[in-house]
Amino acid sequence: MDYLKYGIEVVVKKSEKRKFKLIDYKNIDKNTFFYLCEAEFKGNPKNSRPDITLFINGIPVVIIEAKATLKIDSHLEGISQIRRYEKFSPDLFRFVQFAISYGEEQLYTPTMPNWYKENIHLPAYYWRIRQKINGKKVVKDDIFYILNPSILLEIIRYFIFYRKDEYSKTKTLSKIIARYNQYFATKKAMKRIDEYLSGDSKNKGLIWHWQGSGKTYTMFFIANYFLDKYFSENPVIFFVVDRVDLERQSKEFYEAIQEKKFKTILKRIDSINKLYEVIKSIKMSELSNKVIVRGIYTTTIQKFQYERSKKEKDNNKEKDKDDEDLDLSKPIEEIIKKIEDKLKKEEKEGKIKGLKDLLIILAFIYLKHLKEKNPEEYKKHIENLKKLKDKDKKEEYLINLGNIKRKHILILIDEAHRTQYGILGGMRKITFPNAITFGFTGTPVFKNEKNTFTEFSYPEKGEFYLDVYFIGDSIKDKFTLPLTYQIVKEGDIKSEGIQITLDEEDIKEFIDEWIKRGEDINLFDRKKLPKYINKSKTILLNPKRIDKVAKYIVDRIEEDTENFKFKAMVVAVNRLGCVRFKKALDKYLKEKFGDEAEKWAEVVMTYHHNEEEKEIIEYMKKLKKERNSNDFNEINQIIREEFLNSENPKILIVTDMLLTGFDAPRLKVMYLDKPLYGHRLLQAIARTNRPYPDKEFGLIVDSVGLFKVLTETMALYNMLAEEEIREDFKNNLISSIDEIFQEFKLKLEMVKESLKNLKINDEDLSIDVNTLKTLTKNKDFNNNELKEKLDLIAFYAEDGKNARILKLIDDLKAVIKLYKALGSYPQKIFYIEDIELLSFIYAYLIKKLKPKKKSNRKFWEELISFIHNKMLVDDLTVIEEINLNPDDLDKILKENIGKREIKRAVANYYFILKNSILDKQHDPIYKEILERLERLRRDWIMKRIDDKIYLNAIKNLMELKNNYDKKIKGKSSIERIKESISTYIGENILKDQDIKLNLENTEKLITKMQNLNKLSKLQRKKFKKELSCALLEDLLKELKGKIKDEDAKKVAELSDNLVSEFILKEIWGENYENQ
């Protein structure tokens, strides 16, 4: 493969080597492309004769195995034949990079020599292309796309690699080839990079690819393409993750890919000091062409620290001296001299306190460089610094001098929805302001202070993502599996399920009893009760209920996991819930399956050294004894590995850990007993969607009722794939980050000014934040004076009547909230010290004005236990049907809610209704609802109708769907077909008349068809024609005298359409034409 990519090095003289390229990748026309049919290649036990072999410059690079397109599963025969060729003629596959099987379906697969005639399992993929037809996105199969000469060369060069995992037990060699979604995402990323490096302003992008769609490989493809294309520019690449274990795993993952140039410069940045060294070396490369910093690094976002932790600061005995060296109130020339003298010592001792200080130091190094190389520029900067009286402004100026200006830096961020929005993200951006950044996620978030779209894309310009590959795409391509979602609840559908048999009087008696016992109890407000007696503690944590849920799981788990061929996960509400589930599951598993089943369920969760919960403490003791270890992190890791690689455990019990980033293909079933929302819910249920042999779907068993939340979450995500809706989202829900920053600065100055001029009853209570910032850096600073002033301010505000102080407190809260809303906006780092001080002032005042009463833990524990004992829990039952509720829309229509909420409802209810029937759209009634829904959407977008007319119409469509659902509920396939056609004819031909059609001939033909095995395409075509005739005959016979002559033509056209678009899809499935 390396020969094909990079050429062959040949010794032409004793000491001279020359590289001869086999393929010219830059000048495509200089290559010779041809093919041969049934070319024969030497093999053992017999020669190989692929149907078609494609050659570049006489080298075989692709083979095609062609099979009958009308024969069922013929493409799989082609794949098997290709695998035989690999065994018979391994030498051929030193050059052939991939193969195509062209049969009933068209697949491509990587190929490799099979010297030892083993059973090698290499994946086979569809190649699909995305097009826009009449404004709609259409995805269609096109296997020949990859055989276009320019595309083929690109795939060989950048999208095919060998992989050998040196950290695995087997160290098996395998081969990877890009899927179409990875290829197109890489191409879009490279286009963004090329345009930016050619002068365009856009230097970031969001790759929104669903869980299991190969994001890590996509990151590699982009990084390697960038490295190769801009190698002479000494590129630097960072793979950024948010956990130390992922930092190690990502380095091991990329090391396994056999790309020599890439692997040679791949390193892991495993400490903050190492990151500083890399940043400094990049800065030095900007000052000198002799310094080459080309490199690829894996690191965590947590290393981009503004300053060292408090503990590190406290341990620094020379803190005063360090701060003195960076005292910007001194002459700049004096500072530069001191920095030069101390820099080597500081670096050696690791005393640089954070990225802020590093960048300031790099600024002085840069100024020194200018002094020697460009005195005029140096003088200009010195004059500018002298003009700045404010220390913060000097720091900002210096940081912008010291940061990295290079553009050939690529930052690839995994799980971009998680930890990229605060100070760490801001420091990353201020350090590398000109870097190219791509974020990768399957579930973007869009809260005020955390918005993946604004962070990594340009929603204000209409770009919400660079590339999207969501759930539907992934399932269609079989990269992930569809999910089956079951809702279960206690009791049957009509019963309460859980009943609490106590009232307020019972609770009063309980409290009186406590007082009689002489126990100390604080008075509590009735409003505080929900904080202590909430759903989690009173219902989901109730031992009786957990016992019932555990028994229900054990009763059905054998069937759910197909006799434990697959595995299961239980998601408990919290850590105590995990321990209780473990105890209950062990009991019922042992009862049903015997003593060995006690090893089937294990807990993976966080353990605390200062644990207070008695049940958890007892479990920790038991676990340490069983595992013969005191290291709970190690125990968790062992259980995780056992779940992935051994028969036991068969069930994992979790609450937070492993709900994201845990790839376990054998996991099929999730018993969800914890309320999760938004992207966390999508991340969690996606644990079950990984393909595995014989696994047809992932199963979610929801015992907390999250289906509506899931539907709304999916609706909002799907909304962002609709161009017109994205435009509305942009206009109504996306605030400009620059506007927020300007608002923050104004508010901050106003608050600082208010504090500086604060006087009450002629008493000076002024607080100068700028002065305080300087004082707090002094090791001997005492904040008693500040606290005394704050005590007085709180005292004056105690009665709640001092409007000036109350407004000041509100303003403090508002400015802190605005700061958080800035996410990772780079300029926010220059206001960290302001916000730290204001946050302290605000928190101190609130603590004084609204002190928290000490809660009596024992009292609340006993009260909850008392409620548990008064609770009745029914057995669990599956609820099979989930109905849309038009009454919810009634409330929105009748209530006077804001414009923003109306806009959310417009989009949400559109997608809730659309998603509920999307997989049934072959049904003529559902299809009509979808068409009417789409017309409504376009009318609303074009402002032909207002919000309330739109929502009223949606409500009517919901009612139509619910009424129709009731008609067809519980009916056989044939009865559903007859009911659908009757309803459709009644509404569209007879104009809202009810009619019951018998369709005698149609029914006979369908019954006959259902009793036959698989038909050939020819037989299907014949049957389709017979069915159209039978349906037309039935309709004309039963509608005789009820329709006009001109309507008879409509009926004839309709019968053909109903057969091909509805009846056959109902019988044979959506894709019957391709089967």
Swiss-Prot record:
InterPro entries: Helicase_ATP-bd, HsdR_RecA-like_helicase_dom_2, P-loop_NTPase, Restrct_endonuc_type1_HsdR_N, Restrct_endonuc_typeI_HsdR, SWI2_SNF2, Type-I_R_enzyme_R_subunit. It catalyses: Endonucleolytic cleavage of DNA to give random double-stranded fragments with terminal 5'-phosphates, ATP is simultaneously hydrolyzed. GO terms for molecular function: ATP binding; DNA binding; helicase activity; type I site-specific deoxyribonuclease activity. SMART domains: DEXDc (SM00487). One of its GO terms (biological process) is DNA restriction-modification system. It comes from the Archaea. Its EC number is 3.1.21.3. Keywords: ATP-binding, DNA-binding, Endonuclease, Helicase, Hydrolase, Nuclease, Nucleotide-binding, Restriction system. Type I restriction and modification enzymes are complex, multifunctional systems which require ATP, S-adenosyl methionine and magnesium as cofactors and, in addition to their endonucleolytic and methylase activities, are potent DNA-dependent ATPases. Belongs to the HsdR family. The restriction (R) subunit of a type I restriction enzyme that recognizes 5'-CAAN(7)TGG-3' and cleaves a random distance away. The R subunit is required for both endonuclease and ATPase activities but not for modification. After locating a non-methylated recognition site, the enzyme complex serves as a molecular motor that translocates DNA in an ATP-dependent manner until a collision occurs that triggers cleavage. The type I restriction/modification system is composed of three polypeptides R, M and S. This is Putative type I restriction enzyme MjaVIIP endonuclease subunit. It comes from Methanocaldococcus jannaschii (strain ATCC 43067 / DSM 2661 / JAL-1 / JCM 10045 / NBRC 100440). The lineage of its organism: Archaea, Methanobacteriati, Methanobacteriota, Methanomada group, Methanococci.
